[in-house]
Each structure stands twice: as C-alpha cells, then as structure tokens.
Amino acid sequence: MPDRSTADTAGTAETVGTAAASDITRQVDALLDRSTDGIVMDSRDRRAVVLSRQTVYQGAVFDVEDMRIALPAGGGDSVTVRRQVCRHAPCVVMLVHDEARDLYLLEREYRVGSDLFAYGLPAGLMDDGEDVEQAALRELAEETGVVPVGQDGVIFDHVGAFYSSEGMSDELANIMVMHLRRWESRPRRFDPDEHVESAWVTWRQLAGVPVTASNSVIAIQHEKIQRILKKQ
C-alpha cells in the first residue's frame, strides 16, 4: 500500500504547481493585453467563432479548408478574418533507443517539403481508433520491422503533443522516446510509393547528422537532456 503521506505530499505539490502556472498565465496575459489592437484574446467567455468553412482541396494526405472566423472584439463586437487550414490526421514521432546496445534508430527518405533525402525518425499517421502507443508500435513495425517482445519489451517516454505548424495546419504530433529492452526483427511493410532507409547509430552519430524536421529535433533534444541528467 502506498504511503498516504507521500501521496498527499505529491498531490499538494501538483496542486501548488498548477496554481503557480495559472498565476503566471494571468500575469503574461495582462502584459500581452497592453499591445492589443482591439481583439479580445484572453476572454474566458468569448471565443473565436467559425462562420463558414469550405473544403477547397482533398488529397491523399491532407485536405484544405477555406474558413471565415469571427474574432471577439471590445464592446461585444467582432472582427471577421479569413484563414486556410490543412486538415491532417494526428501523427506519432518516435526516437527509438536500443538500451542493451545504446543505439538509436535513424531513417532517411525523400521529403518533398524540404526537397531533401532527409535524416529523420520513424513517424506516421494515426489510424482511427488507435491510441498513441498502438500507432507508434504499428508504424515502427511497418517502417523498420522492429517489434518489442513481451509486455515489458518497451518503455515509453512521452515527450508531449505539439502542433507542427498551428498557423496553417491542425496536425498534432505525438512525440515520444521508445526505450527497447527486448525486441525482434520482422519484414518491413511499405506502401508502394514509400522508400525508407533505416540504421542503428550511436548517440554521437545521431547528434552529428543534420536532422531538420522540428518534431524529430524535439525528441532528440529531450533525450539529450535525459542523458545529461543520468550522468549527474
């Protein structure tokens, strides 16, 4: 049975931390309000309202919506703006670590956005009904053939969920580090137009190649901090 005093202390610390964060948010909101041009951005009662939306493009990976949105202004008024947004399924991004060998899984493939054969990490879209860990395990198996063995074959270190580019897309990237304790290799399964290379590299090699995808950089920087902390 857990120590009640320890649990109470942890709960109190969490409450205090949440209260402090809320207080900081209020302070920052007050500072930002000084530069307002009339749009009410920190109202708890009034939010942006979607007036209309039209799908103007449908593709294999994303759709594009043209939207008219009413932003709340002072005196109960509103200001209408027009925005386009890429509708994109949420995705998973995984930094995969083989604990026994202290090696990391690096990929290389063509990325049209950067027009590069880019270094990166295993990643992919979540299917309907999947949770984050299910999607990560499926994508890892499909892209690399790496499959954890047993319930304790992998430890997930969830870094967080971040928008890839919130000014133009609703894609939410769920970033994590997967620490493999036991795993086996199986045949990879690619879509016909997927061409991906993968290799196990040392931490020095991983940190030394030019990874340019922001979500991958977040995962690598998180792991860098964890490695530093473990040495202390």
Describe the function of each predicted region.
Residues P72-G74, D98-R101, Y110, H179-E184, ...:
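Short loop segments at secondary-structure junctions
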